């Protein structure tokens, strides 16, 4: 236990920290956004060339001195980027969700990404954006998926090892 605590202040073991819940404690983790955000928002960050937001606003519920909020909605404002219009991105967690209207009234899953555009919406129903659908479906019935334009990852561990050996930097 002492080894696991590392630089965190010493405290007795409690089952609220292990095996998974450590992520939500300020001394140990980064909350839902830090834990899963790097996976969930990777697709919009890469596709829309998002970098540094110019404003961030947060609405939080259940905030304590020791843990991340139980729920939050975070609004990120991004400026124009390489000819792309400014945009706003929202992060929801703790069971909070946007309006089901973004999926034409269907129930929203517990995780996912939705990109709302002028001509339609792109929705990925999981943490890793491994699949997606274009909505409304009838508007994209003849859509042809483009050929992959980014290099495929051999996996986090392999990328890390290659980078350590002086190879290309990891995609992450």
Region spans (language model):
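Contiguous beta-strand/loop segments that form the cofactor/metal-binding neighborhood of enzyme cores
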Residues: 1-30, 34-172
